[in-house]
Amino acid sequence: MARPKNVKHIFVTGGVISSLGKGILSASLGLLLKSRGLRVAIQKYDPYINVDPGTMSPYQHGEVYVTDDGAETDLDLGHYERFLDEPTSQACNLTMGRVYKSVIDKERRGEYLGGTVQVVPHVIDEIKEKMGDLAKNGSIDVLITEIGGTIGDIESLPFLEAMRQLKLELGEHNLLNIHLTFVPYIKAASELKTKPTQHSVKMLLETGIQPDILVCRSEKPLSREIKNKVGHFCNVHDLDVIGLNDCDTIYEVPLMLLKEQLDLRVMKKLGLKKFREPNLEYWKNFCEKVKHPKDGEITIGICGKYTEYPDAYKSIIESFIHAGASNDVRVLVKMLRAEDAEDPKFDISSAFKGISGLLVAPGFGDRGIEGKVRFVQYARENNIPFFGICLGMQCATIEFARNICDLPDANSTEFNKRTRFPVIDLMEHQKKVKEKGGTMRLGSYPCILKEGSKAHELYGKFLINERHRHRYEFNNQFRKLFEEKGMIFSGTSPNGDLVEIVELKNHRWFVAVQFHPELKSRVQKVHPLFDGFVHAAKEFAQGKRQLSLEVEMPRLSSTEMENAG
């Protein structure tokens, strides 16, 4: 198998427990290497048998991250893009399901010449072939591959075997393994315990892989003594034991790893020389704004269907961090369960207590829809900054149709196929689609903005490109009526057929979009819609505080005023 020359491979694995942050580690290392002038790409390998996460429940998988080319991928790709400010693609996320599907398709076409198809060599060879796809055009120096799951999981074994074989083929100076483990702190003993890390490395060794570098997550910093102990029992040099203790924000991780010299250890082992010193001043400034905002805090409510699991809204939450830093405030998120508002006895005004803005989040299905519509109505009627995304835009138009356009049972045909007023309907090209996976309107599409609109003011240009993931769209039969009643269709597809952005006149800030702007917000490039929304919420909060102060300030009598003078 021909492989591109001079491309260095870094594989990131995890042990002891899940959710240690392999994605953040991979993205942080990528940022450090990029800051030294290296061309870096990152990919994620997931061991589940699904072809992609597009049909998986948000409760199990979290957010589905959509790339420009329309791939439905793991949320870790969002971290890669936000940290490196580089687009990802379908090639950056491989699942075991895609591997097996490809192997079976080849068998059906007779490409194995009648042989018995087995995990070794056929599945392993398929994985190794995919491992080099991103490096084939010679446009990168380093390829970082994050392997999902935890060492010891049976599902990950084919990926690990492929990595083992690849290291033999490429040589130890062209491939290294970084193993992320957990060093728990036992409060009763006031000690950090290394035994779980030792056992995790032992399990990795059973697959034939000796880790080159250990990154140890812990509640408290690792002492030199602890690092020496880990290195001694795990057959790793103590300089290759990297401490990564808990921090206030994930955006501090690159700075912590820089201090621990992870990038230097990686470059030395891979024979990478003569690269510039990293300049992360902008990153340090961003972290300072996140940790110590000049103008305090504001609270924004996220009304959604999956509020018990914040990872379902990962990119939205991260976008609020970016926009908060841009506006010198810390954005606190209050999760608002849409289903709660479907109860007529629910006091919606109490839910808005302390909230300076409302975002109605994406989702699918009719559960909680009437609650979302009710939240939209309250924000519109009380002039509270409002931002709707995807389903949030659809709920905004349903609410407007019912309460402003006098279409009492207006709805989406997704929720009520017999509604008299289908203001949201299935897109024409979707009506013959039967399969669920990978069949929505996915990926980046152009949008034309209306001159003088809020959207045009925020973007500062007429043509934008945004990422989509939907089947339903605004029904143009109702466009004229909506415009007459005060709704502005400020963004459409280039041919004008598809509504992408709606706004309201005479409202402090009311913008709803069919696309997913949260997927394109970056540390250095906060998304203009989130930036504008947080700015409006900040002004709203400051206005409420000023009003509160005026109400609380005692009124002086004329005599008292004269005496004061």
Swiss-Prot record:
Mg(2+) binds at residues 76, 146. Residues 299-543 form the Glutamine amidotransferase type-1 domain. The keyword Metal-binding applies. GO terms for molecular function: ATP binding; CTP synthase activity; glutaminase activity; identical protein binding; metal ion binding. This is CTP synthase. HAMAP family: PyrG. Its EC number is 6.3.4.2. CTP binds at residues 18, 153-155, 193-198, 229. Belongs to the CTP synthase family. GO terms for biological process: 'de novo' CTP biosynthetic process; pyrimidine nucleobase biosynthetic process. UTP binds at residues 18, 193-198, 229. ATP binds at residues 19-24, 76. L-glutamine binds at residues 59, 363, 391-394, 414, 471. One of its GO terms (cellular component) is cytosol. It catalyses: UTP + L-glutamine + ATP + H2O = CTP + L-glutamate + ADP + phosphate + 2 H(+); L-glutamine + H2O = L-glutamate + NH4(+); UTP + NH4(+) + ATP = CTP + ADP + phosphate + 2 H(+). CDD domains: CTPS_N, GATase1_CTP_Synthase. The lineage of its organism: Bacteria, Pseudomonadati, Chlorobiota, Chlorobiia, Chlorobiales. InterPro entries: Class_I_gatase-like (IPR029062), CTP_synthase (IPR004468), CTP_synthase_N (IPR017456), GATASE (IPR017926), GATase1_CTP_Synthase (IPR033828), P-loop_NTPase (IPR027417). Pathway: Pyrimidine metabolism; CTP biosynthesis via de novo pathway; CTP from UDP: step 2/2. It comes from the Bacteria. Allosterically activated by GTP, when glutamine is the substrate; GTP has no effect on the reaction when ammonia is the substrate. The allosteric effector GTP functions by stabilizing the protein conformation that binds the tetrahedral intermediate(s) formed during glutamine hydrolysis. Inhibited by the product CTP, via allosteric rather than competitive inhibition. Keywords: ATP-binding, Glutamine amidotransferase, Ligase, Magnesium, Metal-binding, Nucleotide-binding, Pyrimidine biosynthesis. The gene is pyrG. CTPSs have evolved a hybrid strategy for distinguishing between UTP and CTP. The overlapping regions of the product feedback inhibitory and substrate sites recognize a common feature in both compounds, the triphosphate moiety. To differentiate isosteric substrate and product pyrimidine rings, an additional pocket far from the expected kinase/ligase catalytic site, specifically recognizes the cytosine and ribose portions of the product inhibitor. The keyword Metal-binding applies. Residues 1-272 are annotated as: Amidoligase domain.
